[in-house]
Amino acid sequence: MVGKIGFVSLGCPKALVDSELILTQLSAEGYETAKDYSGADLVVVNTCGFIDSAVEESLSAIGEALAENGKVIVTGCLGARKNADGSDLILSIHPKVLAVTGPHATDEVMQAIHLHLPKPHDPFTDLVPPAGVKLTPKHYAYLKISEGCNHRCTFCIIPSLRGDLVSRPIGEVLLEAKRLFESGVKELLVVSQDTSAYGVDIQYRTGFWDGKPVKTRMFDLVNALNQIAREHQAWVRLHYVYPYPHVDDILPLMAEFSEHGYGVLPYLDIPLQHAHPDVLKRMKRPASGEKNLERILAWREACPDLVIRSTFIAGFPGETEEEFEYLLNFLEEAQIDRAGCFAYSPVEGAKANELDNPVPDAVREERRARFMAKAEDISIKRLAKKIGKRVQVLIDRVDESGGIGRTIGDAPEIDGLVRVLPPTKPSKRYRTGEIIRATVISSQGHDLIAET
């Protein structure tokens, strides 16, 4: 009898990749994935434990799985959280779960599954696609290049949950990228906790790819991904890029995108968090000494098509009105294309909880609202400049009203969309996963309307 596993995946793209690894192993061993709790022999819940709302969502999901199914294995970042007395947080709230593991723990999860639901005798490993099992649509996928983080930002507990930086071998990463492109992926989203630090933990060790030596470092990785993507007429999007000086080296590759139409996109997701030097110092941000505004302006000079996304925190402990106004001015001068903002929320175990002068809740929320109003105004004005221009659009889905997709400046789920009107020729149909060219005819908030 084939064992059926229910699966719940919560949290960030890194956690999603962990879920994909577990599901790939389950498929390789002959297990099936159940569509609902009632049809599952047991349920795996991959949790998030970064901020309080994520903890609540994860605990609620565990409780629901226990109520609906009764047999639950928990993995992910929340699995690494402990109570003040050192006891397991999850087991203290949900003592009936079968097992608890931390993040990136595929082997431990599989051992727990084997214990409570022995694997089928005939695994049919040849039925697993070379690219593995993916939770994203077939035309885009996340590529995790490293695990953990060496930074000790005061608002963050990721290092205590996921450990220090561990870079994957560059040959292994590039092989996975090639297999994903060969499986039909048209957009590869590079993720990690710090993409710019790739290889620093192993002193940029020399690896091998395509029979040639290649350094385990950011530029060499991006350069190779750029070449592979062009060969497969696909895109590569970089996330979690810290603004270190060596990031300058990849801007020429991005500037070439307009000539080829494929390769590494002129898009950088940079987790800046703030702009004022004193706030960055209290946050213990790794780039607090960098002149971020000057660097961003230089990047735009080197690559005029560059789109920058970033996230920020409003109301961090000790933040004054003057420091917040400094952040708003930075946002205006840097012309951040896509910006998100969180009102600071204390995270259990974070060093920031010990800082003086906490900002009142109402002030935090008021500053977040002011930030988002400014960010939206900048984004809308920058999008309006695209009206009348030809853009590439990756089609995410098709309906009776045409196609819905994204430009090179839009990452899935977090940025804007493009509504492409139906083709003028009745015989023409858009296809999910194809990259088309369209003319922007109007903008609506964060989104665009285009026609072919």
From Swiss-Prot:
Residues 384-452 form the TRAM domain. SMART domains: Elp3. Transmembrane segments: none annotated. Its cofactor is [4Fe-4S] cluster. Residues 135-381 form the Radical SAM core domain. Its EC number is 2.8.4.4. It catalyses: L-aspartate(89)-[ribosomal protein uS12]-hydrogen + (sulfur carrier)-SH + AH2 + 2 S-adenosyl-L-methionine = 3-methylsulfanyl-L-aspartate(89)-[ribosomal protein uS12]-hydrogen + (sulfur carrier)-H + 5'-deoxyadenosine + L-methionine + A + S-adenosyl-L-homocysteine + 2 H(+). Keywords: 4Fe-4S, Cytoplasm, Iron, Iron-sulfur, Metal-binding, S-adenosyl-L-methionine, Transferase. One of its GO terms (cellular component) is cytosol. Its main location: cytoplasm. PANTHER family: RIBOSOMAL PROTEIN S12 METHYLTHIOTRANSFERASE RIMO, RIBOSOMAL PROTEIN US12 METHYLTHIOTRANSFERASE RIMO. Catalyzes the methylthiolation of an aspartic acid residue of ribosomal protein uS12. This is Ribosomal protein uS12 methylthiotransferase RimO. It comes from Polynucleobacter asymbioticus (strain DSM 18221 / CIP 109841 / QLW-P1DMWA-1) (Polynucleobacter necessarius subsp. asymbioticus). The gene is rimO.
